[in-house]
């Protein structure tokens, strides 16, 4: 019996990458509060499936998201930031909202003075060497 001089590694599987983004909203008036509510509702809507078919027996897939890191160039145009890795098409897997991050504080009428939102995304494709070479 001879010793094997080569290292062996058991490759099991790749994991899909996940990304989390945290936002803090501090609306100053009623219009800004309504805008924040629309943003939250938009993400909650697009992360959810839809019932379809006769007797609502089937679920459709949730919306997909293409996330890009952008910056404003000196000429005022938005440009993609190449210093960050690209992100493949994602689905939103979580939308956590806290309406009382600093305790219960509200404007007249009950609207919260501060809201935090955490969004979780997961890519829909596995990362390969070819995709890494493309900047992912």
Task: Please annotate each region the language model reported.
Residues 1-136:
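Acidic, Ser/Thr- and Gly-enriched intrinsically disordered low-complexity segments
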